[in-house]
């Protein structure tokens, strides 16, 4: 028997471990828990997660202009998912560190005034959550078992720390929004794979044989004087400087170094012997 769309989505969330929480549980998140394992890990009820995803999709569809929706993620695992979500829905994305005052300081160059805020983790993105409360901006957030729900209007219970779980959650939310907008349906399905929403590791270092080579000019050491192509041949001696007399130079140096050849003492000079020979 073929599974319904809801059952398929829940199976996908199970495979991505969206149901695994942490060993701590916030008292406001207890309503979304299914049970607690023997090792202390809380299990999230994915039925309620699916219901909250549909609720969040209805809120997103209610915004006429998608540019009034802002999606944020300070976690590295959610940054690629945020970019893809914004690409397919036409909303704004902010990945990485949130600049304080983006929603409150109108003098700031990067000032934004969204009508809806979507967050990956309310604990990591605590600064935009706080600013949204000042500006009365509705907030949707993916909340883990230990996430605080202060100033969060719609909490979607799920694992927001895994790279696969975050990608699946944003994928399902984007697909639900497109279905409600009637941009995709049974006859015109969404052909985007969920893998595009997953975090990807940085490219590995190149192999030793593929190291970059630089031009010799400007980077190589200068050739030694008199160096020959054949290393077995001796280099020609350097020519002596014309008119150079090493003995005279040495003699002049010795004469100048003597105490007798030094300049006479300045007037008013008192010899050390006048003080007993020592200070």
UniProtKB/Swiss-Prot annotation:
Cellular location(s): Cytoplasm
A single GO cellular-component term on record: cytosolic small ribosomal subunit
Family, as annotated: Belongs to the universal ribosomal protein uS2 family.
SUPFAM superfamilies: Ribosomal protein S2
S-adenosyl-L-methionine among keywords: no
Function statement: Required for the assembly and/or stability of the 40S ribosomal subunit. Required for the processing of the 20S rRNA-precursor to mature 18S rRNA in a late step of the maturation of 40S ribosomal subunits.
Protein name in UniProt: Small ribosomal subunit protein uS2
HAMAP family attached to this UniProt entry: Ribosomal_S2_euk (MF_03015)
